[in-house]
């Protein structure tokens, strides 16, 4: 690859970005580094700029690559897009961004023939769901009468605790037998080979640990590795990272924030920062910028540091803010009806002032429908849409959904360049078309895509849901399911693929039936015209102009006495989603928990915090 590389001395951040000192030190570092980066610190930009430095200076020497591992697919996609934006697609082709699950699955799928026969899964194994795991245990001889939650606690969650190979010295035989059923399937019980992602990670770790040639191949492929949201890393995931890169020349940059460690319930490793520093002899750098939140909101966030056992840091805010910017309210209501009245009116006022409707978010600790039903009804009376985002959040991240959305946009005359670029890129990958092909092949491909979109446009004048369903199916058939399954591992399950398409059909048709406008229907489906409502866990990594946290009550934080640190982290995550304003509500009467009568005795420290700041304005109704 011939290219004029930039010298490390002459390199400067892409797009004119000014990085704080420790961020710049991280970007150009040649050592393993743990970066402690709080909310709004610009973690995605930091990693994108580091990728640019490594690629543009050839510090990541061609043809080696950079591997970025994230928890969520959308986070992995966002980072990949940011790197492409900062240094161009040619250089970014050596930047791989994927989830832990995808990384582990690629290793197993590529090298599974190197596994001992006893641990080698079937070629076309499925991804196991909770009910599949339970059935495997039952086939293995377990008799368990509890519900699925009880089963997960007693058996399902413990299935992959141990590294392979499994021995009865360390684990009950029923677990080994269930592993075998899941690995190999069971014809007598019509059970196909099905693996959980935790099992896949254990198989990947075992492959690398027992085969030095595979470990060497991975080391030779990647000169640098980025680990995002590192505070949520599980022991299984960390074991895989160590198997791949411990004592290797690969340089690892791990970015996380202990104040946002809210995934302990999902197996996050409490000691992950300390373990990484000890195992990889990493340096530690702390970022002090908060580019997201207004100064007064950052002051509230800082008061949480002591309660989260974090060292006090002199946080700095973005220069776009004035010193007095930021609003915070604590609203105390007699009942949830009055709460809904006031919040709906407040939201209506914000919209009238020009705040985009999807830049306002309603957060709850749990049970979205319980805490937001009345608010949704009141907002509807004011012609403001609000919806439970959990129904859409994962769906909208799916590749097949993104493809269908872009096709319908282009067919509906909303011909945005981004959609054209995306469709040409993704269909080019599906059809195996490369930019280096001869002009005639490229031209034929462009004509094929345009004909597909023109045909879709010509058939948009449909009258019922059945016709819409047939139209969507015809577009998928014209590309072919096999191409989707070949490109996207998750779509090898035809049932999973069909379920996603069915959800798209139902959701978009509901919106079109209401608006009779395809652009509005797609916009509504994407949530551009509605207020998102979600749990704190679903809000992680997101930001909004204004946050309304509904139900700062004991019944919402019902397990606070048993997990105070994790609930404090959850509170901190909610607090730090807001850019300009945050409102907390308490209702003395609410149909939630064991009693309608609500209190805040257990979580009163949050209320004391509000008083201590002298920033949060308390309003009683």
Regions found by a protein language model. Give the residues of each.
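Conserved RecA-like helicase ATPase core segment
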Residues: 2, 235, 240-324
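Coupling/switch/interface segments within P-loop NTPase motor domains and analogous charged loops
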Residues: 116-192, 439-488
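Conserved helicase/translocase motor-coupling segment
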Residues: 340-423, 453-495
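Helicase P-loop NTPase motor core
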Residues: 282-283, 289-382
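Walker B catalytic acidic pair
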Residues: 229
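Accessory N-terminal region flanking or inserted into the helicase ATPase core
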Residues: 2-37, 41, 45-46, 65-67, ...
């Amino acid at each position: 690859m011939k290219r004029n590389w930039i010298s490390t001395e002459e390199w400067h951040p892409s797009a004119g970005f000014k990085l704080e000192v420790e961020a710049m030190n991280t970007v150009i570092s040649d050592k393993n580094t743990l970066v402690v980066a709080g909310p709004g610190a610009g973690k995605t930009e930091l990693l994108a700029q580091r990728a640019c430095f490594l690629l543009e200076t050839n510090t990541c020497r061609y043809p080696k690559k950079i591997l970025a591992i994230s928890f969520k697919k959308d986070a992995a996609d966002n980072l990949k897009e940011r790197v492409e934006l900062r240094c161009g697609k040619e250089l970014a082709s050596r930047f791989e961004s994927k989830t832990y699950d995808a990384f582990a699955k690629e290793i197993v799928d590529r090298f599974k023939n190197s596994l001992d026969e006893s641990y080698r899964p079937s070629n076309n194994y499925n991804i196991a769901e909770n009910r599949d795991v339970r059935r495997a245990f039952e086939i293995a001889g377990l008799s368990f009468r509890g519900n699925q939650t009880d089963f997960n606690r007693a058996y399902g969650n413990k299935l992959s605790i141990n590294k392979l190979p499994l021995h009865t010295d360390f684990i009950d035989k029923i677990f080994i037998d269930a592993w075998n059923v899941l690995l190999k399937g069971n014809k007598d019980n019509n059970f196909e080979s099905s693996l959980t992602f935790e099992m896949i990670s254990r198989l990947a770790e075992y492959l690398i640990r027992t085969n030095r040639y595979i470990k060497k191949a991975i080391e030779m492929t990647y000169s640098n590795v980025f680990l995002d949201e590192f505070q949520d890393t599980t022991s299984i995931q960390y074991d895989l990272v160590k198997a791949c890169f411990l004592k290797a020349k690969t340089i690892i940059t791990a970015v996380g924030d202990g104040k946002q460690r809210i995934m302990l319930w999902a197996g996050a490793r409490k000691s992950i920062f300390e373990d990484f520093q000890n195992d990889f002899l990493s340096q530690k750098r702390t970022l002090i910028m908060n580019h997201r939140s207004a100064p007064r909101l950052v002051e509230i966030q800082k008061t949480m540091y002591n309660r989260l056992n974090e060292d006090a840091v002199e946080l700095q805010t973005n220069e776009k803010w004035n010193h007095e910017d930021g609003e915070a309210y604590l609203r105390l209501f007699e009942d949830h009806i009055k709460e809904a009245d006031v919040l709906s009116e407040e939201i209506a006022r914000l919209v009238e002032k020009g705040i985009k409707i999807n830049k306002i978010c309603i957060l709850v600790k749990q049970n979205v429908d319980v805490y937001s039903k009345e608010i949704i009804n009141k907002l509807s009376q004011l012609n403001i849409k609000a919806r439970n985002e959990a129904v859409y959040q994962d769906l909208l991240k799916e590749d097949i959904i993104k493809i269908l959305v872009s096709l319908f946009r282009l067919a509906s005359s909303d011909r945005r360049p981004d959609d054209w670029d995306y469709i040409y890129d993704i269909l080019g990958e599906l059809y195996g078309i490369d930019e280096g092909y001869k002009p005639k092949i490229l031209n034929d491909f462009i004509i094929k895509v345009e004909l597909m979109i023109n045909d879709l446009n010509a058939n948009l004048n449909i009258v019922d849901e059945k016709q819409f369903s047939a139209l969507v199916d015809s577009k998928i058939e014209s590309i072919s399911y096999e191409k989707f399954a070949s490109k996207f591992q998750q779509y090898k399950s035809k049932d999973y693929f069909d379920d996603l398409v069915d959800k798209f059909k139902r959701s978009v048709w509901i919106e079109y039936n209401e608006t009779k406008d395809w652009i509005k229907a797609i916009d509504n489906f994407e949530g551009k015209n509605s207020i998102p409502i979600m749990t704190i866990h679903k809000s992680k990594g997101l930001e909004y102009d204004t946050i309304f946290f509904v139900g700062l009550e004991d019944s919402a934080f019902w397990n606070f006495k048993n997990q105070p640190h994790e609930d404090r982290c959850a509170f901190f995550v909610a607090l730090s989603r807001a850019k300009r304003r945050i409102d907390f509500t308490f209702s003395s009467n609410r149909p939630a928990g064991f009693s309608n009568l609500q209190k805040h005795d257990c979580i009163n420290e949050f209320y004391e915090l509000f008083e201590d700041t002298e920033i949060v304005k308390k309003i009683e109704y």
